[in-house]
């Protein structure tokens, strides 16, 4: 076995006497005398945090046997230089972390075993000597040092004692990313990741100056994004990452890493002079309450929030644990966070409606369900592809409309479902291979018009779809316990393949019941309907269709699972196509088919305006694609002089209107004039919507 003091490759020195390059913000003088008491407290916390997970003695013995005389592991392939081959090389660092835990766990067979130490030191020396790179920059800048951090922190005291040179080179390795101004400037999850191992190096070297620089950077990362493409927490408390081609929802993966990174620092520095600023803690809590909580339902993150990782395990114990960690810190809104935890565990419901205007994304949470609408504009993109994942994500931002009651409606069938039939979308269904939206490229919408408005309980959203020789005006009207979906101006230039609107493509779970215009209900037999139907019920979701609209219901396989697909076929080369349907989440079969009378009226469904009124409350919602007017019971003529989203409720002299513009930061108008029953008022356009009384 090679000695730990083997000749090591030269790396830039970024230890306790780091000197910055010209133009760098690095450390230019020896660090001042550290606050040793606090530093040691943080160091003990880190050590304790990294220690759990000691492997069995048999695993330790086997790993020691696999270390060659040069310090490499026989089960790791170090030779590949292909893109993402770093994933294989990271096994070296994972093995080291296992051995380090065995070495540092009191009472274990290998606790402070010198042979084990020598084996670890040899493998560490091998790693820093070779200083592996990868065509994917992430591995050397983030992945490798993040993995290596565990071993270096656990063994740092003994390395200082036995191998000072190895110790120095290991800490230099951890500090390399911080030395590169471009990498130190990373935002979002990548930014917190780089701070993690830089922080670890600062703590074990007792470099208080560097430690405060890292904490300052973390404070700067807990902020509301300002620029159009800035990553991280957005002004509406959504989370975005990989925004090169447009803002991209990414709470489920990168957001999770970002949250873990911020909590990492909050936990380690709690009660010390290094704590995050109070206003940063308050913002972070608000992000949990207004962002994280709304994207979660029945132990799973919304698919829209998972980026290219749609097919990964997106179930959510990790998010429960993250929220519990924040609440455990005793922050000012601990009680509200405990309410989120109760919701995540299924002991409480989160109800209401929220429009994430920054991301063209609406969440509706009626009693017993969660429904979402994901649109895109020239400002936003759908789920990306990259690193071999998400290759079928082309249509994920084209009106995806997922409805969940039980929580498992989609995940079991994703691997084999039809990606040209994403629920809510209107697309050309052909046999051509879809382009992969690599890192978001090609995933943006074809129009500036997209968005919505919410009053906190109800909401309306919509967009102009323009892609692949197909255009459509699409909107969703969310009322308390149902929603209406409208499509108009469906114009296709493709004569070789039909345009289709998918109402839902969902896991088949039990019987599918159909009712004709007379109201007589029967179970679907075979693989699809053979006669018209006006209502359909399945798995506690009801669907209602307009007379003569001719929806189709079919059952097919996705792997070993059966799938129910409900859709409209608009035909080839269609001009002026449209659709209307309503969806009732969380309703039993008997209650749905026993529902009599009309719940809503479609006031308009044209390329100029789409509007729906709830019969019970009189609440009226509209999408004006241009200046226009609709007639609504109790309100008379309801008009707007500019494109907008609008909610109107009340009657007589007490009508409240809530509006939002459809152009986000690209808007050129500051207000819209709304007229109700002959009375007009100018309502300002504000991000997130604004209200006025008429």
Regions found by a protein language model. Name each.
Residues 61-308, 312:
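Aromatic-lined, polymer-binding surfaces characteristic
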Residues 258, 265-655, 661-669:
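Extended polysaccharide-engagement surfaces of secreted carbohydrate-active enzymes
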Residues 30-78:
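N-terminal mature-domain "stem" immediately C-terminal to a signal peptide or N-terminal signal-anchor/transmembrane
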Residues 14-40:
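C-terminal segment of N-terminal export signals and the immediately downstream linker at the start
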Residues 1-17:
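N-terminal export signals
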Residues 358, 577-582, 683-694:
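C-terminal beta-strand-rich structural cap/linker in extracellular carbohydrate-active enzymes
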Residues 631, 635-638, 663-693:
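C-terminal accessory/interaction regions of large nucleic acid-associated machines
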Residues 35, 233-234, 514-520, 682-687:
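A generic structural motif
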């Amino acid at each position: 076995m090679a000695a730990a003091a083997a000749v090591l490759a030269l790396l830039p020195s970024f230890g306790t006497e780091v000197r910055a390059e010209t133009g760098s913000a690095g450390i230019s003088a020896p660090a001042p005398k550290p606050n040793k008491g606090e530093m040691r407290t943080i160091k003990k916390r880190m050590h304790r945090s990294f220690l759990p997970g000691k492997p069995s003695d048999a695993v330790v013995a086997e790993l020691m046997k696999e270390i060659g005389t040069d310090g490499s592991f026989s089960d790791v392939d170090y030779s590949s230089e292909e893109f993402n081959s770093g994933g294989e090389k990271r096994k070296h660092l994972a093995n080291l972390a296992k051995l380090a835990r065995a070495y540092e766990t009191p009472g274990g067979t290998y606790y402070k075993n010198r042979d084990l130490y020598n084996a670890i030191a040899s493998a560490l020396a091998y790693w820093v000597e070779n200083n592996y790179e990868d065509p994917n920059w992430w591995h050397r800048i983030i992945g490798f040092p993040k993995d290596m951090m565990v071993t270096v922190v656990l063994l740092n005291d003994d390395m200082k004692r036995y191998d000072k040179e190895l110790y120095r080179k290991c800490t230099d390795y951890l500090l390399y990313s911080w030395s590169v101004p471009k990498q130190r400037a990373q935002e979002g999850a990548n930014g917190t990741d780089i701070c993690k191992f830089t922080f670890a190096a600062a703590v074990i070297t007792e470099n208080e100056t560097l430690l405060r620089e890292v904490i300052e950077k973390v404070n700067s990362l807990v902020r509301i994004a300002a620029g159009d493409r800035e990553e991280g927490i957005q002004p509406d408390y959504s989370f975005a990452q990989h925004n090169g081609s447009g803002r991209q929802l990414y709470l489920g993966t990168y957001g999770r890493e970002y949250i873990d990174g911020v909590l990492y620092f909050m936990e380690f520095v709690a009660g010390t002079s290094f704590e995050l600023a109070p206003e940063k803690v308050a913002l972070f809590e608000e992000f949990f309450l207004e962002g994280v909580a709304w994207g979660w339902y029945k132990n799973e993150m919304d698919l829209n929030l998972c980026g290219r990782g749609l097919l990964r395990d997106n179930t959510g114990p990790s998010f429960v644990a993250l929220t519990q960690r924040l609440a455990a810190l005793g922050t000012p809104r601990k009680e509200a966070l405990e309410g989120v935890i109760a919701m995540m565990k299924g002991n409480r419901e989160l109800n209401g409606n929220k429009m994430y205007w920054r991301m063209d994304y609406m969440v509706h949470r009626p009693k017993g369900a969660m429904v979402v609408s994901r649109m895109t504009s020239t400002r936003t993109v759908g789920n990306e592809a990259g690193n071999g994942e998400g290759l079928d994500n082309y249509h994920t931002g084209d009106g995806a409309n997922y409805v969940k009651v039980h929580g498992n409606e989609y995940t079991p069938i994703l691997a084999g479902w039809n990606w040209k039939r994403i629920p809510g979308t209107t697309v050309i269904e052909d046999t051509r291979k879809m382009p992969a939206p690599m890192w978001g490229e090609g995933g943006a919408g074809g129009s500036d018009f997209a968005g919505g408005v919410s009053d906190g309980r109800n909401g309306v959203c919509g967009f102009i779809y323009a892609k692949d020789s197909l255009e459509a005006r699409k909107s969703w009207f969310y009322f308390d316990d149902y929603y209406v979906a409208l499509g108009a101006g469906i114009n296709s230039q493709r004569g070789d393949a039909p345009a289709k609107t998918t109402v839902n493509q969902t896991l088949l779970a039990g019987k599918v019941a159909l009712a004709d215009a007379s109201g007589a209900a029967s179970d679907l037999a075979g693989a699809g309907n053979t006669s018209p139907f006006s209502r359909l019920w399945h798995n506690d979701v009801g669907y209602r269709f307009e007379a003569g609209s001719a929806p189709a219901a079919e059952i097919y396989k996705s792997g070993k699972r059966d799938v129910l697909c409900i859709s409209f076929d608009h035909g080839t080369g269609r001009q002026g196509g449209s659709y209307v349907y309503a969806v009732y989440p969380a309703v039993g079969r008997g209650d749905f088919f026993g529902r009599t009378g009309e719940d809503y009226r479609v006031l308009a469904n044209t390329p100029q305006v789409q509007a729906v009124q709830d019969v019970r409350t009189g609440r009226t919602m509209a999408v004006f694609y241009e200046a226009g007017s609709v007639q609504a019971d109790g309100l008379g003529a309801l008009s707007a002089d500019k494109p907008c989203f609008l909610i109107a409720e009340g009657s007589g002299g007490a009508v409240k209107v809530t509006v939002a513009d459809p152009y986000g930061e690209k808007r050129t108008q500051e207000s819209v004039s709304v007229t109700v029953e002959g009375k007009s008022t100018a309502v300002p356009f504000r991000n997130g919507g604004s209200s006025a009384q008429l």
